[in-house]
Amino acid sequence: MIKIIVVLFSWFATANLWAFDNVKLSLDWVPQGEHGGFFQAIAKGYYAEHNIELEIIPGGPSVNTKAMLMADQVEFNIGGSAGALNYAKQNLPFTAVAAFFQKTPQVLMSHPNVGIDHPSDFKGKTIFLSNFGRLSFWGFIKNKYDLSDDQLESYNFNSQPFIDDPQSIQQGYLSSEPFAIKKAAGFEPVVHLLADHGFSAYANTIEASDKLIAENPDLIIRFLTASRQGWEDYLNNDPQPAFDLIQQLNPDMPSDKLVYAHSKMIEYNIVTGNGEKIGSMSADRWKEFYEMSVELGIYDSKFDHEKAYTLEFSN
C-alpha cells in the first residue's frame, strides 16, 4: 500500500521527529476530489506543523475501513451521519468528532429542458436507485414529494438506461455521475442536491474510537485543526498540490474530474453549508436526522442518538 508521509524540512522539526504522532486516516472511497482538503493539508505541511505524520489509507468497494477503525488499525475513519448513528444503535464505542461536509453530495438527476426541474416534478417518472439509495434517502424523498415505490427501477451503476429515457431520474454523486454523463452523452443533467431539499445528513465525518477520545484528545484537536487548514486552503487557493497527491495514490483519477469535483464542492457549498465553520456539527442537526430516520422506519426503535457524536472538538 502506498503511503503518503509528511516530510519535514526545517531543522527544528527534524530535531523533534521523536515527538511526532504517526496517524492513519482511512477514506470512505478511493482517493478523489472530495478528499482534497486532507491531501492539501499534507502537501502544505499543516499536519507537520501540528506534529502529525499522516498516512492515508484508501477505501474502495472491497475495503472495509470501518473494520479497520474497530480493529484499532487506524485512528480516524471518514464516515457519515448514518454510520455514526449505527454505532450508537449497536452500542459500539466509536463516535463522530467532526463533519467536513455540511451537505451530503448525494444527488438525483434529470434531463435538461424536459420539465423535470424540481423533485415535485418526479411524480409518475421512472427513478433509477441502487439498494443504498433505497435504504438511505428514498424514504425521505418519497414522503416529502408524495412519490411511489412503483416508480423505482434498479440502478446498477450503468447510466445508459437514464440517458436513453429523457423522462427518467437517476441517483448520483455530485462529482461523479453528472461528470460521466456529460462526457458520455454530451449533456449536463439537472442536479437535485438532496441536502438543498432538506436531507440533513452530514458527510465526510471523522470517526474516532471512544478510547482515543478519552485518552488523547490533544491528538484529535491537532488533527482537526490541521485538517481545517487544509480544507480552507484547498477551497480558496490552488488545489493542484492536493490533486498531485491524490493521483499518486489513485493514478486512474483523471485531472479533469478532480477539477470538476473541486468546482462543484465550491458551487454547492458542500464544505461550508450556510456559512458554518469548517468541520463543525450541531446537536439540532443530529437530532433532526435521527428523528427523520426513526420516522421513516430506518430504525425500528429509539436509542440514545447523542452517543453518535461529540461536539467537544468540532466547534
Model-derived features with residue positions:
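Sec-dependent signal peptide recognition
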Residues: 1-11
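Bacterial Sec-exported substrate-binding components of ABC uptake systems
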Residues: 20-21, 313
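Pocket-lining segment of extracytoplasmic ligand-binding domains
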Residues: 82-83, 157-252
